[in-house]
Amino acid sequence: MKLNKEENFSEWFDTVLRESGLYDYGRYPVKGMGVWPPFGFKLRKLVLNIIRDLLDSTGHEEVLFPVLIPKTLLEKESEHIRGFEGEVFWVTKGGHEDLDVPLALRPTSETAISYMESFWISSYKQLPMKLYQIVPVYRYETKATRPLIRLREVSTFKEAHTAHESFEGADSQCAEAIEIYKKVFDRLGIPYMISQRPPWDKFAGALYTVAFDTVMPDGRVLQIGTVHHLGQNFSVPFEVRFHTEDGDKDYVWQTSYGLSDRVIASLVAVHGDERGLVLPPEVAPVQVVIVPIPQKEEEQQRKVLEEAKRVEEELKARGWRTVLDDRDELTPGAKYYEWELKGVPFRIEIGKKEVEGDELTVARRDLKKRVKVKKGEIHQRLKEMSDDMLNNMRERAWSFMKSRIKRVRSLEEAKELVEKRYVVELPWCGSKECGLRVDEEVGRVLGVPLDEDAEAKGERCAVCGREAKWWIRVAKTY
């Protein structure tokens, strides 16, 4: 595999997913639905471990809701159903009989969870309630589907749902969710822009939506996480009320925030190279592969394999996910190719020199170079190199993303740069009319930056020429 991801990202991405064994897409006989083979499932599990750890440590509790939602529930919040109705899969028959009420395959769970919270919540003492689940969701995508990026079955959807006593409590929860997501992406080395989506592009039923976006190798932007302040838009129709400390009754204030398969899509796309995957050690299904170098003499070959097994046992005992590749039908070069494609962070090569000396030869996936490590220091050095590798991957990814963001002051400049797959920031007066014109003529408005100073002091709106209030981000998106 020698594909350039910047020149032909789509082919590169599909090839890496398939040949690495990460995700099998396009062969299962339902459009927009793929299969996680064992290698990909292990990666998925390790990424979810990070997410679960960060949610559990901040007081979230995991739940599991049914996949079917009655149409009567979805219709209770009118703006919500308008936003999703065209994307819903409906179950209308049970066996040979028509159902009295059509059932939706869960597109998201605000309605289902609000319904149950109306039974569960009665007092301010139960608040905040912070729940999450990791489940498949279903969207009838009519656009071209893409593996892990645009699917009809989003098999890995982490949705958190919280309930609070006040607007401010929910607002603070949104801030906490943003910090959690920053930690998730930082541990994966994925760069991100944080923007408040414009009012016409917020989540259906939310007061406001904050989104995390990253820049893919082809310059298009991928939304990788969202945080929504729902206000009381769901608690009122679903009667989610509680007794306040003063003895009154009030409706809870809610938030929801989600991550999906796109986290893994961005992990693959941002870090991979012409040889395949490049994975951060924390989430690599195999962290270390040991490759014995074949020897002509039988006794020397035996010693090489013994040393390889000794190193394997030591590393496994220390907690490293380690594979000894002692297949004799493959050359070392063929093994290097296969394990590089799978993104294994470290390869230890053991031959005659390593048997007779006190050093091991270690190849690091992100740098494509070999280093010598003393045998007694292998565990500590791998720990140090793991930290250095993540930092290197993170810095390289952030550098690329920042190089794709340009600040301009006219629609003409913006159009030209967006066509060249840059993210542009341009001054905006704040009016919906001007924002929609940018949407139509330039690219999708991502929103007002929250990760930098977004006030456009002294600037003029790029559309109407009036005094600008904010800088807004615009890009071509998936």
Swiss-Prot record:
Reply yes or no: does the keyword Aminoacyl-tRNA synthetase apply: yes
Which SUPFAM superfamilies does the protein's record reference? Answer: C-terminal domain of ProRS, Class II aaRS ABD-related, Class II aaRS and biotin synthetases
Q: A Gene Ontology CC term for this entry? A: cytoplasm
Q: Mainly resides where? A: cytoplasm
Name the EC number(s).
Answer: 6.1.1.15
Q: Where in the cell is it found?
A: Cytoplasm
Q: What class of enzyme is it?
A: ligase
Which InterPro entries does the record associate with it?
Answer: aa-tRNA-synt_IIb, aa-tRNA-synth_II, aa-tRNA-synth_II/BPL/LPL, Anticodon-bd, Anticodon-bd_dom_sf, Pro-tRNA-ligase_IIa, Pro-tRNA-ligase_IIa_arc-type, Pro-tRNA_ligase_II_C
PROSITE patterns given in the database record: AA_TRNA_LIGASE_II
The keyword ATP-binding is annotated on this UniProt entry = yes
GO BP annotation list: prolyl-tRNA aminoacylation
Q: What keywords appear on the UniProt entry?
A: Aminoacyl-tRNA synthetase, ATP-binding, Cytoplasm, Ligase, Nucleotide-binding, Protein biosynthesis
The source's superkingdom equals Archaea
Reactions catalysed according to its record: tRNA(Pro) + L-proline + ATP = L-prolyl-tRNA(Pro) + AMP + diphosphate
Gene Ontology MF term list: ATP binding; proline-tRNA ligase activity
Q: Name one Pfam family in it.
A: ProRS-C_1
NCBIfam families cross-referenced by the UniProt entry: proS_fam_I
Assembly, in brief, is: Homodimer.
**Function text:** Catalyzes the attachment of proline to tRNA(Pro) in a two-step reaction: proline is first activated by ATP to form Pro-AMP and then transferred to the acceptor end of tRNA(Pro).
Q: Reproduce the free-text note on domains from the UniProt record.
A: Consists of three domains: the N-terminal catalytic domain, the anticodon-binding domain and the C-terminal extension.
The similarity comment for this entry is: Belongs to the class-II aminoacyl-tRNA synthetase family. ProS type 3 subfamily.
Q: What is this protein called?
A: Proline--tRNA ligase
Organism in which the protein naturally occurs: Ignicoccus hospitalis (strain KIN4/I / DSM 18386 / JCM 14125)
Q: What is the lineage of its organism?
A: Archaea, Thermoproteota, Thermoprotei, Desulfurococcales, Desulfurococcaceae
- Gene name, please? proS
